[in-house]
Every structure is written in C-alpha cells, then in structure tokens.
Regions:
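Positively charged, low-complexity terminal tracts
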Residues: 1-85
Length: 85
C-alpha cells in the first residue's frame, strides 16, 4: 500500500527577502508498507525544485514520525506561533 497524504509545492512567495541562498524545496508526505516487514511507515520526501527524482525520502516508523511532529510543534512555539492540533 502506498498513499499520498499531502504535498507542498515551492512558491517564490515563500521566501523572505534576503534569502537568496536558500534552497527552493518542495515536500510530500505519504504512507507506505512496501517493506519486507510489511509495517506501515510515514514517508517524507524533500526535493529541490527542478531536480525531480533527486530528492531525499525518509521512511519513518510511527515513533520517529511522532518525534518529528514534536520537534515541529516545539519549533513553532519557539517562534511564537500556535502549534495547531
């Protein structure tokens, strides 16, 4: 099983002024159980715009995905933003 959950295509408007040296990245989140152990994992793919197929894909166990979620939650709090649900 593979299923796309969400993706975010890069937009020039996403960059703050003065961030000329920042990579233009798009990301996608999916789930997959196409492994020898058949355990479902969360797949996070990050690709530089214009380099389709050359991105990095992380295959996260549920515990690893929760740790990433917590890190994003904490980062949002650090910059004074509500972390959401």
């Amino acid at each position: 099983m593979r299923r796309s959950i969400d993706d975010y295509p890069f937009a020039e408007a996403d960059l703050p002024s003065g961030a000329d040296d920042v990579a233009h990245l798009s990301w996608a989140v999916a789930i997959s159980d196409d492994y020898d152990d058949a355990e479902p994992r969360v797949v996070l793919t990050v690709e530089e715009v214009g380099r389709t197929g050359a991105g990095l894909a992380g295959h996260f166990t549920p515990d690893m995905a929760r740790r990433l979620r917590l890190a994003l939650h904490d980062a949002l709090c650090e910059i004074g933003e509500p972390p959401g649900a």
